[in-house]
């Protein structure tokens, strides 16, 4: 009986680690969805890049990546978000 419990525990642990591994590998930005937005505007000097969430997500969002690599979900209709997107699209002058 104890062998059956141990076997069940090992099987459960294996399945869980497989699931977590898949979630980690699949965490590129195109598969990231946002479930809440940041309430405060980011300082412009922190922003490095942006991307939109996938169409398969339940709500649209703009994900800004900071210079430190942090990803921040923002509402795409906020004026400051639209301004930052516009600034990031503009080619930089040398």
Swiss-Prot record:
Listed InterPro entries: Chemokine_b/g/d, Chemokine_CC_CS, Chemokine_IL8-like_dom, Interleukin_8-like_sf
Keyword hit for Nucleotide-binding: no
Key words, A-Z: Chemotaxis, Cytokine, Disulfide bond, Inflammatory response, Secreted, Signal
Subcellular location: Secreted
Disulfide bonds: 33-57, 34-73
Leader sequence segment: 1-23
GO MF entries: CCR chemokine receptor binding; CCR3 chemokine receptor binding; chemokine activity; CX3C chemokine receptor binding; receptor ligand activity
Record SUPFAM superfamilies: Interleukin 8-like chemokines
A single cellular component GO annotation: extracellular space
Tissue: Ubiquitously expressed at low levels in various tissues including heart and ovary.
GO BP of this protein: antimicrobial humoral immune response mediated by antimicrobial peptide; cell-cell signaling; chemokine-mediated signaling pathway; chemotaxis; eosinophil chemotaxis; inflammatory response; monocyte chemotaxis; positive regulation of actin filament polymerization
Function: Chemoattractant for eosinophils and basophils. Acts as a ligand for C-C chemokine receptor CCR3 which triggers Ca(2+) mobilization in eosinophils. Also acts as a ligand for CX3C chemokine receptor CX3CR1, inducing cell chemotaxis.
PANTHER family named in the record: C-C MOTIF CHEMOKINE 26 (PTHR12015:SF73), SMALL INDUCIBLE CYTOKINE A (PTHR12015)
Family named by the database record: Belongs to the intercrine beta (chemokine CC) family.
Subunit and interaction comment: Monomer.
Protein known as: C-C motif chemokine 26
Organism per entry: Homo sapiens
Annotated gene: CCL26
